[in-house]
Each structure stands twice: as C-alpha cells, then as structure tokens.
Amino acid sequence: MLTAKSFHLICAPARCIELVEGIKTRRAELGQSLEEPLFIWEPVPDLCVPAELDNTIKALEHVDIISPNHAELSDIFSVVGNTESGDVDGQVIEDCSSKLLSGLSASRASKVSVVVRSGKDGCYVASASKKAWLPAFHAPTPDKVVDPTGGGNGFLGGLAIGLVRTGDVVEASKWGNVAASFMIEQVGVPVLQTEGGKERWNGVVVEERMKEYSMRCETEGSR
C-alpha cells in the first residue's frame, strides 16, 4: 500500500497534512525510486465550515485534488449551494471553487484541482488551466439510479485511476462519473462477471461505457 500511485484521504484538514507528510516520509525510507503519488482529499462534512477555511487552504498545499460534494463546498463559505428548485447552483459552485484555488501559494497554484461531486448534476472540475462541468452518466436515464450509497467513493476511485492513467483531471473525472454510475445501479456492490475474457460489471464492459460517455460529453458539451 505504501508504494501505491494514489491515496484517497477522508479526514480533517490537519489530519490530511499529517497523513501526506507521514506517507512521503515512509516512502522515502523505503530507499526505492518511486514517482510522487497523487493525493486525493475528501474533507469530512462536519469540518466543511467557515471556521476551517484557513486550515482547508493549508491542507490544499499538500494534495493534488480536493473533492467535496456541492453541499460541503458551499458550507465552507456559508452560502446556499442549491437553487430554489433544488438543483445545484452552478454559479455558486464555480465561485466557491475559484475562491479555494485563489488561496494557494504561487508554487502550488498550477498543481491543485477542485473536483466537486454534484449528484444528479454530475461534477464540476476547476484548476488553474481548466474549468468544466461534466454530466452525470445516468442523467438521461434517472430510473437506472437505485441507491446512491457508495457513489461518491466509486467516483473517487475512478478519478484516481483516471488521473494515474491520463494525468488529466477532466478526463479523470469522466472515469469518476462512469465508476459512480455502476455503484448506484443497485443496492450493494455491482455484479462482476467475466464473459469471453472480458470483465463485465452489471453486464457492461467498463471501456464501452467510458467510450459512450466520452462521446456524449463531446456532443452535448458541458453545462
């Protein structure tokens, strides 16, 4: 585990810094030539409050990605993240993401991204060079959503794999949305089967769903 290419941290800001520094120190002690790992931080909901904003910015200096959901992000700035109709307020999410990034030091400003998980509204990705809304995979077929439990963790697992493979946060977020789509199609975990030498999750080959979703993003564009 210590030689992993990515780490998903779910913790308070101070604990995030402690974990990142500890992991880096222990990796150095291995005496191996290892690439710098990716750190994806999911802040705990009860500390997504204005009083923790400064600590959140400090923790951002140590990670590659921060990924709150839309409610947690808006809570950090004590603003309402939903419209009166209940939809995610895209402008609020974009503004809050920009505020987080603006607090970074010059040396880290180009290396950190905010990825906001927004349920049925997909996700918002923001970095110094890229900003994009990506739709939820099941947005056209909401009846396929059975239980959202595990969707966030599935998303971040897919995001981590996508980042390691592509190095592009927007492309990686597509992987996240596709991974989440499998997690929410049933109560419990998706069903894995192997047919013709190919893995199928809930009867679907992941690469085929990824291709379908990427084409949809290209034709429909972002929000």
Where are these regions (language model features)?
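Short, charged/polar "capping" segments at the starts of alpha-helices
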Residues: A14-L19, L47-A51
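Glycine/charged-rich beta-loop-alpha catalytic/anionic-binding loops adjacent to active sites
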Residues: K130-P142
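Conserved phosphate-binding/catalytic loop of the ribokinase/pfkB sugar-kinase fold
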Residues: M1-C16
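Conserved phosphate/ATP/ADP-binding segment of small-molecule kinases
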Residues: K24-L38, P43-W133
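Glycine- and other small-residue-rich loops at beta-strand/loop junctions that grip anionic moieties
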Residues: L9-I10, P45, P148
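Conserved post-catalytic alpha-helical subdomain immediately downstream of the catalytic base
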Residues: S110, A139-R223
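Alpha-helix N-cap/helix-start capping motif
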Residues: P13, H70-A71, N153
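A broadly conserved amphipathic alpha-helix scaffold signal in soluble, globular proteins
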Residues: K5, E21-T25
